[in-house]
Amino acid sequence: MLSEKTIRKAYKNLRKGKTRRAEVKYIDAHLDDEVQKMHDMILNTKPDGVEVQNPKLGFKPHKHTPKIIYEHGKIRKIFEPEIHEQWLHHIIVLVLEPIITGTAYKYSCGSFPKRGAHYAKRRIEKWLRSDPKGTRNFLKVDIRHFYDSIRLDVLMRELAIRIKDEWFLHVI
C-alpha cells in the first residue's frame, strides 16, 4: 500500500475522466510531491495509541454533505470525497481487489472488473441454453439503497477474517 508504484497506479486510475478538473491538473503538475504527500499521509495514519512520526500528516476524513443524483432511472445519495480522499480510496481498492475477488462467489456480478452486466447476461444465457428443464424465466434483483444498509461492524469483521493487518483495517 505504501509503495510508490501502488500510489502512482491508484492516481492513474483516479484521474481517468477527470483530467479537466483543477485539482487533477495541479497534481499532474506536481506529481512527485503529491505522491510523497500521499505516502506520508498513509504512513502517519495509525490506530489510536500507535506512535507516528508526524500525526498532523495523517489522514482525517472530511465531513461530507450528501448529494442527490439521478442515474439510470434511480435516485442515489452520494458523498463526494476530496481528491486526496479519492486517491486513498483508489489505493485501498488496489490492495483489496485481489483479496476480495479471490474469495468471492464466481457469479457475483456488477462490482467486479470484467464481471459487469454483459458477463451476467452471458452466464444466464449459457445456463438457459444448457437447461434440460427448459427454463425460460429468471429473476433479476436489485436491493434498493443496499449500501446505506450495510452494517459497518459486520463488514469490518468480515474483512478482518481475510486481512490480518490492523493498520490497514484502520485505514479502511
Predicted stretch roles:
Residues K74, K114-W127:
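Short acidic (Asp/Glu) patches
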Residues I7, M41-K74, W87, H170-I172:
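Reverse-transcriptase-like RNA-dependent polymerase core
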Residues G17-K25, H62-W87, T103-R115:
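Short, conserved non-catalytic motifs in the polymerase core
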Residues K5-R8, D32, Q36, P81, ...:
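Non-catalytic, well-ordered alpha-helical scaffold segments
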Residues L2-K18, P61-P66, V93-I99, R129:
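Short, compositionally biased low-complexity segments
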Residues W127-I172:
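Conserved polymerase palm-domain catalytic core
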Residues M1-N44:
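Non-catalytic, polymerase-adjacent accessory regions of viral genome-replication enzymes
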